[in-house]
Amino acid sequence: MARTLLNTSGFNTYSNPSKLKITDMRIAVLGHGNWRWPIIKLYTNQGLIGLGEVRDGASARYALMLKSRLLGENPCDVDRLFRSLTQFGGAGRLGGGVCGVEMALMDLAGKAWGVPCYMLAGGKHRDRVKCYADTPARPDPEEMGNLLKDRMVSGFEFLKMDIGVQ
């Protein structure tokens, strides 16, 4: 019996990663009130769906403009696809669409290969991550202080303040 160097027990047997192709891209918007979180959904010919978040107010419409560059492509080819998408601007608010697509590609690649997508990004480096609390600016210093104090009482050790100079 031939000895294999690759343990295939963890692979998704319903997926053939080398023949995986993106067939559609859609946006689902989650949220309520003034808060909206566009989620990119990449669909494949093998029934896998990859999800990625369009970050902090970036344009979901811009993300959809990238669709034509993705259809028919193998989502496991994350780096090449990411580089082709960043030709059209990667910084600022437009970059959020590209970042969301990259997340969805990594999600698909991880599902296709049967591994968590963090393994595709270099592996696990820690067991826990500390979160910070963003705090929008308030014109009244006392009100700002109370907001920060409330976040500290809630258990946050790291605080971010959106302040400006006027």
PLM regions: where:
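Metal- or metallocofactor-binding catalytic centers and their adjacent structured scaffolds
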Residues: 45-115
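N-terminal secretory signal peptides and thylakoid transit peptides that target proteins
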Residues: 1-4
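N-terminal small/glycine-rich loop or linker at the start of catalytic domains
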Residues: 46, 113-137, 165
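Structured beta-strand/loop patches that form or line metal/cofactor-binding pockets in enzymes
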Residues: 6-51, 55
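Metal-dependent enolase-superfamily TIM-barrel catalytic cores that perform enediolate-based chemistry
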Residues: 128-166
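Solvent-exposed alpha-helices and their adjacent loops that cap or buttress functional pockets
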Residues: 15, 32-33, 123-125, 152-153
